[in-house]
Amino acid sequence: MNTYTDHDYTYSDAEFAEMWQLLAETNGRDGRPFNWTFSRLENWRFASWDRSPEEFRGMAHLWRDGVGRLAGFTITEHLDIGDDLELQTRPDCRDVEGEMLEWLERRYAGERPELTVTCFTDDDRRAGVLRSRGFREARPIGNFRAYDVTRRRLPVPLPGGYRLSDLSEFADVAAYARLEAVAFNNEYCDERWYRGKSLSPHYDPRLHVIVLSPDGEPVSVAHGWLEEQFCTAEIDPVCTHPDHRRKHLAEAAITEAFNRLSARGGRVAWIVSGAEPNPSNRLYERLEPTGLWTAHRWAKAV
């Protein structure tokens, strides 16, 4: 049986590199996002331009195996009390998950009314550990789809006056940030947010595909991320301005992003959506995924 020790996250570059490698390797070898995607971790670290090192230190916790290698970590995406507490583990260290949950229960006792953890519907091992500790399955929260990007796709025709571009060509980042702010109703998405995000190690503005309106404004986006070690990718975010929806703009942007990822050696790309009945699921099914996994939220009062 493996033995583990837990450690505070110190916000060091070396720790971040270990966390990134664990995610890229576990997801890349299986071809499915068992853990967070590498791009989600990069966004967590770099897009939160106003988050202090002290705040970051309180959002993750590490576990190491008997030889000091990173076995897994817990992480939360936001500082909100109701945000999910995620378990990220190496496949050969799944037995650490009980210790992780025990630590989370101690850490947040009296601070949160309940703990929420995500678990894929086909992950019987984690579900068993959660049940044994008194968690209950609450509801589905998201769908994860995989796509074969080695398959060349025909471009999706755009309405008259609209055209494809990317953020290596379109320089008005404030205008781009307004697109996401409006589409997601999130005023945090501004120029400072974008400039932080663009410092991510695997940010490539040529993969940040956008659609420009006849007036030259960005109105849709499919942002591709690619890591070259395992040739895995993610498209995140995907959105369209409310005034320009139902024109197949997002489908055109995603298709272009797929083809650009393929040209750079991408093998598989993942897109995450809200759970049903989120309307985005219809678009993502039309794109013919090769795999679909649903994540559920589990909860326990503490």
Task: Place the predicted regions along the sequence by residue.
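Short glycine/proline-centered loop/turn elements that form peptide/ligand docking sites
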Residues: 254, 277-280, 301-302
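Acyl-donor-binding surface of acyltransferase catalytic domains
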Residues: 77-160, 295-301
